[in-house]
Every structure is written in C-alpha cells, then in structure tokens.
C-alpha cells in the first residue's frame, strides 16, 4: 500500500493483486504525479478520458470529474475499483471501457499512461483520432526511459504536433495537439500462419507475442497431452494457440479460454471461429482475474504459460495467484501443466502449493511442469 498526495486529494493506493510486504511495489509512479500537476490549475471542460490507468491513481484523483477509464486490463479495472472503495469514492464515479469500445466524443482532456506495447498505443491513438478535437488537451506520461523516438513519431503520425517535456523524477510527459493528419486505415488484427497446422492466427493489438508464436508456447505445444475429457482451461490464453491445440488433440474435452485482457479473449474467440469452427460449441471464453469466482473442483486440467510481469513491473504475484486458483478449481487428481523460464524456479512453488511437482520436459531455456491435486490439501 502506498500514499500519494497529488494536489487534488490525498490518496492511499494499493496494487492488485497485492505484492508481498518484503518486496513491495508501488501502486502509482512519478508519471501519475506529473500528469496531475499539469491539470492542477486547468479548467476541465468536456469528458475526461484516462487510458491505461494501472491501479486507479488518475481515476481516483479525478473522480469528481466523472472520468472514463479505458484500457485492456481487467486487473487494472479491479485494482481501480478497489482503490476507489478504499478511498471512500463511489465506484460509479468512473465509467470503465475496454480499448475496443467506442470512446466518448469531444473529450476536454485525455490522459494517457504510455503502454508497454507500441501496437496497443497505436490502436488507442487511432480510436482517439475519431473523437478528439483541436481543443482537446492530450497529455501522455511514462518513465523517461520508456518514451522513445518511435513513441513521439507515432503521436505525430496519428494525431498531430507533438512535444515532450523535461524529465521530472525520471518521468517525462508528451503533449499533443490534434490536427487531423492524413492516415491510411489499419487492420484491427495482425495475422500469421501457424506452422504445421494450416491455421491462421489473428492477434489484437495487446496480445502477447502478436507477431509470431513465442518460443515458450512452441515448446509447450510439443508436449500437450491427448485423450483428455471433461473441462480443461487455457489460463492466461493470449491468442489461444494452446487452447486451439488442446481442442484439436482432445475432441472429447471442452476448453475454457481465460485471460484478463479483453483483446486476448477476443483473439482466442476469433481464432477458434476461423480455424476450428466445428469445435466452437466446446468452448467457453472468460475475461477474469485468473479463476476468481469459479466454483471449486470443476476442471480436469489447467494449462498455463504464466506472465512474470505486470505492465512494466517484474513480479511473480500473478503466477502465484494463478497456481492457487488452479488448485482450488481442479477436481481431485486434476492436473496443472505450466511452461516457464527455467530461472523462475516454479518447481518449488508448485510443490509448496500442491505437495508434488514433476518435470515433463526441459530445454536450455524452458521447463514444463505438472502438479496434481491430491486430496483436500489447502
């Protein structure tokens, strides 16, 4: 939990999911403060749009202006809602939209936390282009090291004249004025052929490894089991290539695709529809924080390529939560399969949670592990 005094109100903020007390990560950063400083004496007219507000620092500070919080992270939405409640602010003060929704017309102010991926930034800037005016104040912020020439060029190309500020507390801002530059349309997804399958994989802007199959997933696909039945889960599904492979290898099974990114879940749905339409009735698609709210003892198997970062921060908290959720939702003798970088040492984490862990395969970079739910051990 961390405290920020932003000139609008004094806030107490925490990350979601929370980090441990030994190595705490802040729920806000200098770029949030810097952005809010720019508005301290500015009269705000028209809708306020906030993009990629990681844990609600901006939304909480500007709640009296009824802002729209726009992003591609259900975890960020949950974190923002929790911080609103924690600071005594009505959740209804903020309207939440995902990045593929239509943005409100003629906003007075747009605040952007620059996302990790340039593709997501371009998608969001193109969406803003349809609604902003020359009078809209557009300000973006990030750590100075995360604002590159390519970032500034993208603002210039999509929206118009762009300048950057001096660094402050290692953060930097981007100021942009909309001038309606000429810009050709761009496809909503990036597509590529998946070798040895005949499948075409479609990827929305914020999908992990959207330009090609990542090497961890490729290794995982070589060792997926066959002849499973019942319900199985592609947890943290991304574009759904693991779930697609499971559908093809296990014609008696139903596959549940789960991710906290609406773009990932939409990509998975599109990839099943276009590549295995006959299997679509065996699928469920879920935007969720891991398996929160899912009934226990439901699944026969869970497959996971867990992230070890959240936005720009390195953390294993999300993976840890995924493992605990998987154990709760597996049937007795149900199996969790994961692929991970060898250096992360998930073997001992899984053994601590499940009481057992086995190595299925390994190479010089990745390891595939299996843990089995035995009895009712917590």
Swiss-Prot record:
Which chemical reaction does it catalyze?
A: guanosine(1835) in 23S rRNA + S-adenosyl-L-methionine = N(2)-methylguanosine(1835) in 23S rRNA + S-adenosyl-L-homocysteine + H(+)
Q: Does the keyword Cytoplasm apply?
A: yes
Superkingdom of source: Bacteria
Its Enzyme Commission number(s) read 2.1.1.174
Q: Which CDD domains match?
A: AdoMet_MTases
Where is this gene product found?
Cytoplasm
List the signal peptide residues: none
Q: Which family does it belong to?
A: Belongs to the methyltransferase superfamily. RlmG family.
Please report the name of this protein according to its UniProt entry. Ribosomal RNA large subunit methyltransferase G
